[in-house]
Amino acid sequence: MAAQLNELWQKTINIIKGELTEVSFNTWIKSITPISIDKDSIRLSVPNQFTKEILENRYKDLIINSMKIITTKKYDIAFLISSEEALETDEDQETDTNNVNTDTSSSMLNPKYKFDSFVIGNSNRFAHAACLAVAEAPAKAYNPLFIYGGVGLGKTHLMQAIGHYILDNNPKAKVVYVSSEKFTNELINSIKDDKNVEFRNKYRNVDVLLIDDVQFIAGKERTQEEFFHTFNALHENNKQIILSSDRPPKEIPTLEDRLRSRFEWGLIADIQAPDFETRIAILKKKADVEHLNIPNDVMVYIATQIKSNIRELEGALIRIVAFSSLTNKEISVDLASEALKDIISSKQNKQITIDLIQDVVSSYFNLRIEDFKSARRTKNIAFPRQIAMYLSRKLTDMSLPKIGEAFGGRDHTTVIHAYEKISSALKEDDDLKYTINEITKRFSPK
């Protein structure tokens, strides 16, 4: 089926190429990767939201009609952002709740996420070396391997690169890549449909298990229980486990201690935001892959303005190329400034509000904003709520009554108590200092 889809797509883009300018073709069509085909629809992977919107609004009909020339059939086309592919696959697999999917092939892996397409810099060199070592010698180098870092820094790329490398060198290897959300959903379905044995066979009879965003199993007792036994079964059988998270194990709240200690058994590698030189290298790599002619001063401008993560960096580049294509203007620093003005100004003008603080703190502790406003006083909610109140008092000009009101109508004395408690604890608690520092970083313009 994959070979049939690739052949169809190659014929399709050959037709499309004759309908577009070279710049438009290279900018929009060349970035598409076919994912799957069924009776009536075809799903295509695209790199970002901006590209998805342009394709849907300007090129979707061209793609559909070009395919119809080849197949005489009008397929429905769905564009998926690369990061959505796993979620979409999860949903497909869950539609048949009477069957636990046992696919352990490379179909779960994005073909773009390989070691040779990963840009190495000071911010990720250690993590890259660790991943390559694991790929070359599964279960012999570091087990488990735990990778952590912020959104869009390349964790998923490195994890899937491990899977590709192992399968390229041993096609018979059983490799499973899964998000923690999918793991949880499959567990729920297996319990509901009395398919526990099939579920356990899928995840405990593999050579390599890659779990992305493992922090989301925190607070889910049944999922943690199941994953604990899965981890033990694989580790005891000398099978490789790779985990990713947005923070180190010690900073994942409501994670069971027995899992936390196991996550720390092997090697922990972090990925930081790319430095200036790495950002330039990433932009050059993207331009080369997409056959884009981008002046050096424009790349310097992008790298100077966009510092947070790789997705935003590549998205800015595509936005500039699109702006150039749609306005028929040559790519220059002035054009780049105009194309990115909304993005840059929104970052520069980002004000810290109570709503923002609640959003960031709840996300950090894997809670809902509603939890902060509820009457619940369990430790896993009360402590993050106090941190959010402390930051609201420290970082905004809102009055104590206004802060209390934002946290479910609490009295101003409750806010004072929270502020004083956190302030006092910060004098001696290094872990709390680290937590506050990590949360505060998320407020800063990037």
Swiss-Prot record:
Residues 325-446 are annotated as: Domain IV, binds dsDNA. Residues 73-107 are annotated as: Domain II. Its main location: cytoplasm. GO terms for biological process: DNA replication initiation; regulation of DNA replication. The keyword ATP-binding applies. Keywords: ATP-binding, Cytoplasm, DNA replication, DNA-binding, Lipid-binding, Nucleotide-binding. One of its GO terms (molecular function) is ATP hydrolysis activity. Residues 1-73 are annotated as: Domain I, interacts with DnaA modulators. Transmembrane segments: none annotated. InterPro entries: AAA+_ATPase, Chromosome_initiator_DnaA, Chromosome_initiator_DnaA-like, Chromosome_initiator_DnaA_CS, DnaA_C, DnaA_dom, DnaA_N_dom, DnaA_N_sf. Pfam families: Bac_DnaA, Bac_DnaA_C, DnaA_N. It is found in: Cytoplasm. SMART domains: AAA, Bac_DnaA_C. The keyword Glycosyltransferase does not apply. Oligomerizes as a right-handed, spiral filament on DNA at oriC. Plays an essential role in the initiation and regulation of chromosomal replication. ATP-DnaA binds to the origin of replication (oriC) to initiate formation of the DNA replication initiation complex once per cell cycle. Binds the DnaA box (a 9 base pair repeat at the origin) and separates the double-stranded (ds)DNA. Forms a right-handed helical filament on oriC DNA; dsDNA binds to the exterior of the filament while single-stranded (ss)DNA is stabiized in the filament's interior. Domain I is involved in oligomerization and binding regulators, domain II is flexibile and of varying length in different bacteria, domain III forms the AAA+ region, while domain IV binds dsDNA. NCBIfam families: DnaA, PRK14086.1. Belongs to the DnaA family. This is Chromosomal replication initiator protein DnaA. The lineage of its organism: Bacteria, Bacillati, Bacillota, Clostridia, Eubacteriales. The gene is dnaA.
